[in-house]
C-alpha cells in the first residue's frame, strides 16, 4: 500500500517537473550593458548595433523609474520582427 502512494506521489511530482522544465530552458537571455544608464531608446540603439547586435538596443525601465539600463536585442533567435524590412522601397506583388 505504501509503494502505491509513493508511486502516485512520484508520478505527480514528475508531471509537475515536466511542465516547468521547458519554460526554464526556453528563457531568452537579454544582454544588458553593466553600469549603463539611459533615458531613451535612441541612445543605445546605435551602440548595440556597433557591438554586433543587428536588431539594436532599447532602454529597459522599471515602473516609476525615469532612468533605465541599456539592453541589446539578442540576434540568436529569429522572431517575427526579423521579417520586417527596414527598406521603404520594397515592392510587394500579388
Swiss-Prot record:
Protein family (similarity comment): Belongs to the DEFL family.
Cysteine pairings via disulfide bonds: 32-72, 38-59, 48-71
Subcellular location(s) per record: Secreted
Transmembrane segment boundaries: none
Organism, scientific name: Arabidopsis thaliana
Entry keyword set: Antimicrobial, Disulfide bond, Fungicide, Plant defense, Secreted, Signal
Keyword Transmembrane: no
GO CC aspect terms: extracellular region
InterPro entries: DEFL
Name of protein: Putative defensin-like protein 88
Gene Ontology BP terms: defense response to fungus; killing of cells of another organism
Signal peptide: 1-26
Main localization, broad class: secreted
Amino acid at each position: 500500500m505504501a509503494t502505491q502512494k509513493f508511486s502516485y506521489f512520484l508520478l505527480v511530482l514528475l508531471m509537475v517537473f515536466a511542465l516547468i522544465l521547458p519554460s526554464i530552458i526556453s528563457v531568452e537571455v537579454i544582454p544588458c550593458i553593466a553600469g549603463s544608464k539611459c533615458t531613451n531608446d535612441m541612445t543605445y540603439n546605435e551602440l548595440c548595433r556597433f557591438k554586433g547586435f543587428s536588431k539594436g538596443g532599447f532602454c529597459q525601465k522599471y515602473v516609476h523609474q525615469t532612468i533605465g539600463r541599456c539592453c541589446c536585442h539578442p540576434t540568436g533567435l529569429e522572431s517575427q520582427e526579423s521579417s520586417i524590412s527596414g527598406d521603404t522601397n520594397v515592392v510587394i506583388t500579388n
